[in-house]
Amino acid sequence: YPSKPEAPGEDASPEELNRYYASLRHYLNLVTRQRY
């Protein structure tokens, strides 16, 4: 089962935030695909 991506800190750069949201979206896709 995929692990949830770690949230970047308060001082994260925009690149880190974009990478986090992209990985989070990928993680949610994996989780919901396995559920149905």
Swiss-Prot record:
PTM annotation, UniProt: The peptide YY form is cleaved at Pro-2 by the prolyl endopeptidase FAP (seprase) activity (in vitro) to generate peptide YY(3-36).
GO biological process: feeding behavior; neuropeptide signaling pathway
Statement: the UniProt record of this protein carries the keyword Phosphoprotein: yes
Record GO terms (molecular function): neuropeptide hormone activity; neuropeptide Y receptor binding
Modified positions (Phosphoserine) in chain numbering: S13
Keywords: Amidation, Hormone, Phosphoprotein, Secreted
Location in or out of the cell: Secreted
Residues found modified as Tyrosine amide: Y36
An annotated GO cellular component: extracellular space
UniProt-listed Gene3D superfamilies: 6.10.250.900
Residues with site note (Cleavage): P2, S3
UniProt-listed InterPro entries: Pancreatic_hormone-like (IPR001955), Pancreatic_hormone-like_CS (IPR020392)
Family: Belongs to the NPY family.
Protein name according to UniProt: Peptide YY
Gene source species: Oryctolagus cuniculus
Lineage of source species: Eukaryota, Metazoa, Chordata, Craniata, Vertebrata
